[in-house]
C-alpha cells in the first residue's frame, strides 16, 4: 500500500470525480495502475448508476444548434436544478448536440449509445440520474433555433421569411405552446374528443339546438386556433394571427419543434 500515494489518489479523483476512499480502494485493487483503476471505478460506478435510473428526472437543460442546413435539439434531464447548473452537465449537453450535427446522427437511440459511458460517469459524479430524454432535428434552407432560459427550446424551418421575423415566430412558439402547425393537422380523434366535451357543456345552457350548434361551433373554432400555430394571435402584435403575418410576407412555416423541460418525462 505504500506506493498508493496521496498524489495518485488526487489524480484519480480529478479524473473520475469519485470519492477519496473509492479511489484508494480502486488503486489498491489495481496495484497503483491509474488506467485500470479508472476502469475499476467505472464498473463499480455502473452498479451505483443502475440504482438511480428509476429516479425521476424533471430538471435539466435544452440544447440546440444549426449546422449545414440541419437544426438539432436535445433535452438532457437530471433530478435537481443544482445539477442542471453544473458545468459538467452543461458540457455533456453541448457535446451531445455538436456530435449529433458533426456525425449527422438523427436517431435518439444512436445518441444514447454513443454517450452511454459518459452519461454513466456523470451519474456517478453527481449522484443523480441523468437522461437523454428527447432528441429531434429539422432540415431546411432557412432554420432558426431559440432557447429560453435553458428550459424551453424551439426549432423552426420556414420559406421566404427573414431571420428577424422567423426569430420572433420562434419566440412566439416558445411562449404560446402551439401543438400543431395548422388546424388541418389536428387529428380527427382530438377534434372529436373536444367537440363532445363542448357539446355536453353547451347542453347545460338549455338553449335551442340551433343556438347550441352556433355555441359549439364558436368554441371549436377557438379551440383549433388556440392549438395551431397559424391560428394563434401573434404575441408581438395581437391584432393579427401568425397566419396573417406569414401572408404579409408570402411565407410559410414548413415545420417546428418545441421542447420544454418537464412536459414529457419518460422515466
UniProtKB/Swiss-Prot annotation:
A Pfam cross-reference name: EF_TS
Family indicated by similarity: Belongs to the EF-Ts family.
Keyword annotations of the record: Cytoplasm, Elongation factor, Protein biosynthesis
Principal place of residence: cytoplasm
GO molecular function, one term: translation elongation factor activity
Task of the protein: Associates with the EF-Tu.GDP complex and induces the exchange of GDP to GTP. It remains bound to the aminoacyl-tRNA.EF-Tu.GTP complex up to the GTP hydrolysis stage on the ribosome.
Keyword Transferase: no
Region: Involved in Mg(2+) ion dislocation from EF-Tu, residue numbers: 80-83
InterPro entries xref list: EF-Ts_dimer_sf, Transl_elong_EFTs/EF1B, Transl_elong_EFTs/EF1B_dimer, Transl_elong_Ts_CS, UBA-like_sf
Protein name: Elongation factor Ts
Organism: Buchnera aphidicola subsp. Schizaphis graminum (strain Sg)
Keyword Protein biosynthesis found: yes
Coiled coil region boundaries: none
Annotated localization: Cytoplasm
GO CC, any one term: cytoplasm
